[in-house]
Every structure is written in structure tokens, then in C-alpha cells.
Amino acid sequence: MSALRLIVGLGNPGQEHAQTRHNAGFRFVDSLIERSGARWALDSKLFGETAKVDIAGQPVWLLKPATFMNLSGKSITAALRFWKIEPEHLLVAHDELDLAPGTARLKFDGGHGGQNGLRDTIGLLGHGKFHRLRVGIGHPGHKDRVVPWVLGRAGREDDAAIGTAIDAAIDVLPLAMEGHFSEAMKRLHTSRDA
């Protein structure tokens, strides 16, 4: 695997969405910003906020699309074109209904699994050959409750578990940055914290 050059967190912009389950991807990249001391800057040509940080001595761009979840691909593809980055150097962090809170999983390639930000990105790229960080938010139990679930806030216990999973993912990120994605996956997937 090639080293990562762009990490995108999916979510919805605006204070009213800031603490929702759907914004787990935003939460991941915000945690990277907090650890690095960098700051977000609005970049209208990329339809989102951007920052450049170093992880394991490697420079990497961070992106938070301001397009709302369902149109995330517009921002992601603009950034890939502008920075001349191939999709295999991309990691997209997003919420995952099919994983329990406290669980995070890395993967490469695949479909969208019903996640609309991934659906839009895959549709615009024409393929799913990029890396993903799936941050578990749990499932409400019935498909009719999914929309209010993802747009709602997690309870205290689930919120803490999501934070722990994000921390575990950040801990293995240096391996992924160096091109050791399989090793990063192995460590994250066998971690007791994720």
C-alpha cells in the first residue's frame, strides 16, 4: 500500500450537527487537528475546511467537506484533483451503523454499505478503491429508526466508546502513513480499545 496523503472526515457542517453520531468522521479529523495544533482553514474551491499536518514525519492533508454528507464526493474529488492525489492515497473516516460504539475498522475498497457520503464519493470516482476508517456508532435496531439515530447524539457511554475507538485508530495511523496499512489494520482490529 502507498502512504496516505489525504484524510477526509465525513459529517454534516453546522453547530446543530456537531455532536451527532453521523459526524464521527469529523470527530476523527478534529482529533487529529487537536493533537497536531494545526487549524482548519475554509477553502471554497475544495468545498470544505482543510489543514496540513505531519503524522509520523509525513505531511498529510486533512479535509472536512462543507457540502453535507450526501454530497461529500464533490469536495473529496475536488481535493484529489487539486492536490493531484490518487484515490489509493486517500483515507475516508465515516460513521458505521454495523459496528458497535467503541469499534473502529480499517478497510480498502468495497461498496458504500448504505453510507451516503461514501455512495456519493464512489459514484463520482467510479470505483471504491480507497481506504476507509469505519467508526462504529451502533444500530438502533430497526431501519425506520436509522435517520433519527444517525442525526441524534449518542448517550454518554456510547459517546465515550466512540472517542476511545477514534483514539485507537489515531494510534495506528503512523503505520498507515508509512504504507503499512495491513499492519495498521491488524493492530486496530485486535486492539481491546477498538
Curated annotation (Swiss-Prot):
<dbReference type="GO" id="GO:0005737">
    <property type="term" value="C:cytoplasm"/>
</dbReference>
<feature type="binding site">
    <location>
        <position position="17"/>
    </location>
    <ligand>
        <name>tRNA</name>
    </ligand>
</feature>
<feature type="active site" description="Proton acceptor">
    <location>
        <position position="22"/>
    </location>
</feature>
<dbReference type="GO" id="GO:0006515">
    <property type="term" value="P:protein quality control for misfolded or incompletely synthesized proteins"/>
</dbReference>
<keyword id="KW-0378">Hydrolase</keyword>
<dbReference type="InterPro" id="IPR001328">
    <property type="entry name" value="Pept_tRNA_hydro"/>
</dbReference>
<keyword id="KW-0820">tRNA-binding</keyword>
<keyword id="KW-0694">RNA-binding</keyword>
<protein>
    <recommendedName>
        <fullName>Peptidyl-tRNA hydrolase</fullName>
        <ecNumber>3.1.1.29</ecNumber>
    </recommendedName>
</protein>
<feature type="site" description="Discriminates between blocked and unblocked aminoacyl-tRNA">
    <location>
        <position position="12"/>
    </location>
</feature>
<dbReference type="InterPro" id="IPR018171">
    <property type="entry name" value="Pept_tRNA_hydro_CS"/>
</dbReference>
<feature type="binding site">
    <location>
        <position position="68"/>
    </location>
    <ligand>
        <name>tRNA</name>
    </ligand>
</feature>
<feature type="binding site">
    <location>
        <position position="116"/>
    </location>
    <ligand>
        <name>tRNA</name>
    </ligand>
</feature>
<comment type="subunit">
    <text>Monomer.</text>
</comment>
<keyword id="KW-0963">Cytoplasm</keyword>
<dbReference type="GO" id="GO:0072344">
    <property type="term" value="P:rescue of stalled ribosome"/>
</dbReference>
<feature type="binding site">
    <location>
        <position position="70"/>
    </location>
    <ligand>
        <name>tRNA</name>
    </ligand>
</feature>
<dbReference type="GO" id="GO:0004045">
    <property type="term" value="F:peptidyl-tRNA hydrolase activity"/>
</dbReference>
<comment type="function">
    <text>Catalyzes the release of premature peptidyl moieties from peptidyl-tRNA molecules trapped in stalled 50S ribosomal subunits, and thus maintains levels of free tRNAs and 50S ribosomes.</text>
</comment>
<dbReference type="Pfam" id="PF01195">
    <property type="entry name" value="Pept_tRNA_hydro"/>
</dbReference>
<comment type="similarity">
    <text>Belongs to the PTH family.</text>
</comment>
<dbReference type="GO" id="GO:0000049">
    <property type="term" value="F:tRNA binding"/>
</dbReference>
<feature type="site" description="Stabilizes the basic form of H active site to accept a proton">
    <location>
        <position position="95"/>
    </location>
</feature>
<comment type="function">
    <text>Hydrolyzes ribosome-free peptidyl-tRNAs (with 1 or more amino acids incorporated), which drop off the ribosome during protein synthesis, or as a result of ribosome stalling.</text>
</comment>
<dbReference type="InterPro" id="IPR036416">
    <property type="entry name" value="Pept_tRNA_hydro_sf"/>
</dbReference>
